[in-house]
């Protein structure tokens, strides 16, 4: 479960960071 969650976080993290901080 955790490895899957970690991989999802690695994929979605940059996109969420981009949306939240407006630094794309």
UniProtKB/Swiss-Prot annotation:
**GO CC aspect terms:** extracellular region
- Pfam families associated with the record: Antimicrobial_1
Alphabetical GO biological process terms:
defense response to bacterium; defense response to fungus; killing of cells of another organism
Question: Has UniProt tagged this entry with the keyword Ribosomal protein?
Answer: no
Q: In which tissues is it expressed?
A: Expressed by the skin glands.
Q: Where does this polypeptide localize?
A: Secreted
What keywords were assigned to this record?
Amphibian defense peptide, Antibiotic, Antimicrobial, Cytolysis, Disulfide bond, Fungicide, Hemolysis, Secreted
Q: List the disulfide bonds.
A: 18-24
Annotated signal peptide? none
The record's principal subcellular location, in a coarse class, is secreted
- Record's function text: Antibacterial activity against Gram-positive bacterium S.aureus and Gram-negative bacterium E.coli. Has moderate antifungal activity against C.albicans and strong hemolytic activity.
State the similarity comment: Belongs to the frog skin active peptide (FSAP) family. Brevinin subfamily.
Put simply, this protein is called Brevinin-1BYb
Q: Native species of this protein?
A: Rana boylii (Foothill yellow-legged frog)
